[in-house]
Structure formats: structure tokens, C-alpha cells
């Protein structure tokens, strides 16, 4: 099944203003995410979807294909659906949404999400990593709990499941994961998703994936090893640049030693 990767890049983020254009290793974050997706080789083609000409111009300077979309989309998935509906992309059976703040996303996360769809486990696939007990209370960490067949039961910013007895903390490890900002969709599932208005649960939690769940559409979850997280705040950006410098210093050292 041909896979189209779409990177939604919205300039109007509140926690990190102008996020797609902030610099990571000397280049805009959106450029680094595109480079990462192409490097991993899971998708057959990759484009950036944005509603702002400054993002379009930054991508054009790097030869990155861009699709201009409407500015009023309630979520990244709605933006991806606008791209998928364009005639030039009609041959792609699977759409892969890689959020524009995930420059360190792993191949396992992308390939695992796609495999959920292509194997028929669920019409939507996503990824998650192990979560530590001390981060369960953090609302910026999105948690997911799954059924035994890897289908998501619920996503939340709250601590789920509720730990009634502190002595049971050890049993949480295999039951809860931290969500990673990646989605793969079968084309029909993507069309269904955006045909529904935002659900009250989605609006309360500010989590777009609760829309299909609330309507009975299954989301399969692949669990992968933890990697450097996404970039949502100024502190995240500092951390990401430090991580980038360490990675590239190590790569340069290995190259000189070879």
C-alpha cells in the first residue's frame, strides 16, 4: 500500500510561538522533521501542510514540497485530510501524519503505526512509549491505555488508570503508555474521522484522537522504545538543541575515527 506522509505545520502555536520556524541545529524545526521522515524511508512520498506563507517559503528554500491548506482546521488530522483529498495524492492508500514538532521520531514508531493499518488490525494506527509513574500526573504527557489486542481504550492528560492503592504502582508499567504524535490512517478512516464534528471529549481534553474513539472507530497502538520527545515549549527547544548537538558531535567523532 503506497504511503503518503504529511507534516502539519501551524505557525500559531501558543506555548512555543512560531514553532515550525524556530531553529534546531541551525535549521527550522519543520525542515528537520521533514528530513527525518525522508531519512527513515517509511513513506513513499512526504509533504508539509501549512496555512502560512512563511512556512511555505522556509520549506521552498530547502526544496521541500508544500501544500497550502485552510487556516481554520480544528486539528492536524483535518489538515492532513485536506491534503489527502487533492487529486495528485489519490493513489496513496495510507496517510501518515507526523506532527511537525517530532524531529527525533523513530522508524519503529512510523513503521509500527503503518503496519497496524496495512495488517488490518485497526483502520488507524499510532505509537506509544513506556511512561514512568512520576509523569502520570503531568497534563502535558498524554497517556493511553489499551485492550489486550493493542486497541486503544482511552487517551487522557489525566493519570489513567487511577491508582487507588499506592502499593499497586508496579502493575501500572504494562498498562499505561505515553502517546507519540504519529498517526497512520486508512484513507476511508481518515475521511470518516473528519466527517464528524469535534467531540465534547476531544474539546475537553484537547486531544483530537478522542473523536474517532467516541464514534467507535478503532485505533491500534504500537509500543516502541522511548526516544527524545517532541518540542512544545521553550525548555523543550533548549533540550532538543542540546540533544541535537550531542548526536551530531558523536556522529562527527565516529566519522573522523573511521
From Swiss-Prot:
<comment type="function">
    <text>Activates KDO (a required 8-carbon sugar) for incorporation into bacterial lipopolysaccharide in Gram-negative bacteria.</text>
</comment>
<comment type="pathway">
    <text>Bacterial outer membrane biogenesis; lipopolysaccharide biosynthesis.</text>
</comment>
<comment type="similarity">
    <text>Belongs to the KdsB family.</text>
</comment>
<dbReference type="GO" id="GO:0033468">
    <property type="term" value="P:CMP-keto-3-deoxy-D-manno-octulosonic acid biosynthetic process"/>
</dbReference>
<dbReference type="InterPro" id="IPR029044">
    <property type="entry name" value="Nucleotide-diphossugar_trans"/>
</dbReference>
<dbReference type="InterPro" id="IPR004528">
    <property type="entry name" value="KdsB"/>
</dbReference>
<dbReference type="GO" id="GO:0005829">
    <property type="term" value="C:cytosol"/>
</dbReference>
<keyword id="KW-0963">Cytoplasm</keyword>
<dbReference type="Pfam" id="PF02348">
    <property type="entry name" value="CTP_transf_3"/>
</dbReference>
<dbReference type="GO" id="GO:0009103">
    <property type="term" value="P:lipopolysaccharide biosynthetic process"/>
</dbReference>
<keyword id="KW-0448">Lipopolysaccharide biosynthesis</keyword>
<keyword id="KW-0808">Transferase</keyword>
<dbReference type="InterPro" id="IPR003329">
    <property type="entry name" value="Cytidylyl_trans"/>
</dbReference>
<dbReference type="GO" id="GO:0008690">
    <property type="term" value="F:3-deoxy-manno-octulosonate cytidylyltransferase activity"/>
</dbReference>
<keyword id="KW-0548">Nucleotidyltransferase</keyword>
<protein>
    <recommendedName>
        <fullName>3-deoxy-manno-octulosonate cytidylyltransferase</fullName>
        <ecNumber>2.7.7.38</ecNumber>
    </recommendedName>
</protein>
<comment type="pathway">
    <text>Nucleotide-sugar biosynthesis; CMP-3-deoxy-D-manno-octulosonate biosynthesis; CMP-3-deoxy-D-manno-octulosonate from 3-deoxy-D-manno-octulosonate and CTP: step 1/1.</text>
</comment>
Amino acid at each position: 500500500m503506497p504511503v503518503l506522509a504529511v507534516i502539519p505545520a501551524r505557525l500559531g502555536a501558543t506555548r512555543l510561538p512560531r514553532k515550525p520556524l524556530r531553529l534546531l541545529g541551525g535549521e527550522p524545526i519543520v525542515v528537520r522533521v521533514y528530513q527525518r521522515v525522508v531519512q527513515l524511508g517509511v513513506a513513499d512520498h512526504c509533504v508539509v501542510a501549512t496555512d502560512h506563507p512563511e512556512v511555505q517559503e522556509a520549506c521552498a528554500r530547502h526544496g521541500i514540497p508544500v501544500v497550502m491548506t485552510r487556516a481554520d482546521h480544528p486539528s492536524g488530522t483535518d489538515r492532513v485530510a485536506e491534503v489527502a483529498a487533492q487529486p495528485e495524492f489519490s493513489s496513496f492508500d495510507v496517510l501518515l501524519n507526523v506532527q511537525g514538532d517530532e524531529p527525533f521520531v523513530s522508524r519503529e514508531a512510523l513503521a509500527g503505526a503503518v503496519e497496524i493499518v496495512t495488517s488490518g488490525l485497526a483502520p488507524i494506527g499510532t505509537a506509544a512509549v513506556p511512561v514512568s509513574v512520576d509523569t502520570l500526573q503531568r497534563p502535558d504527557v498524554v497517556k493511553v491505555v489499551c485492550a489486550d489486542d493493542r486497541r486503544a481504550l482511552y487517551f487522557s492528560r489525566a493519570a489513567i488508570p487511577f491508582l487507588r492503592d499506592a502499593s499497586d504502582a508496579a502493575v501500572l508499567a504494562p498498562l499505561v503508555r505515553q502517546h507519540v504524535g504519529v498517526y497512520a490512517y486508512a484513507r476511508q478512516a481518515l475521511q470518516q474521522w473528519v466527517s464528524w464534528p469535534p467531540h465534547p471529549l476531544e474539546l475537553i481534553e484537547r486531544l483530537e484522537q478522542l473523536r474517532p474513539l467516541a464514534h467507535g472507530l478503532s485505533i491500534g497502538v504500537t509500543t516502541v522504545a522511548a526516544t527524545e520527545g517532541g518540542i512544545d515549549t521553550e525548555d523543550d527547544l533548549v533540550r532538543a538543541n542540546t540533544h541535537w548537538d550531542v548526536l551530531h558531535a558523536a556522529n562527527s567523532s565516529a566519522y573522523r575515527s573511521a
